[in-house]
Amino acid sequence: MHNIFTPDTNKSSVSKSANEQQIEANLRTILTRLGIIGDTGSKDIITIVKYMCMHPESVDTMTVSELCSKFCDNPKSMEQRIRRTAFNGLVNLAHLGLDDYSNEIFVDYSSTLYNFEQVRKEMDCIRQKTVKHGNLKIRHFLTSLAFRCQNAQ
């Protein structure tokens, strides 16, 4: 009876955790499609992207190192794990593009999560047309992931 008359202050936290769970589910789907969900840095990516989605106003001016420093004592190692995992996603995406240029995953992510020119450069490297690998911008990758996770709801 007491619960009926007391104001429910937990509703916002429940909806926030439901929103957070939805963002994490969307993020895990994307990382699975890229083939990097099992990589060590995928946990770091999930942590940072969830934070970016929950605090969009404070993240705009922060660097990736500053973001990483919020979650661990050694932000450089976290940033390196994220970089390696994101690069593995780039390589997996390039392989998909080589196999089937019209692959749904390739079409969806080659120009949104990564710079398409860099995906092409990685495809050329795999074909051994060049020795230069594709580059990636971690900030762009994380921001694009956050955007896709928020708008996939």
What spans do the regions from the language model cover?
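Short, charged amphipathic alpha-helical surface segments
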Residues: 1-10
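C-terminal output/effector regions of signal-responsive regulators
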Residues: 11-77, 81-82, 90
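Flexible loop/N-cap segments at domain edges
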Residues: 63-117
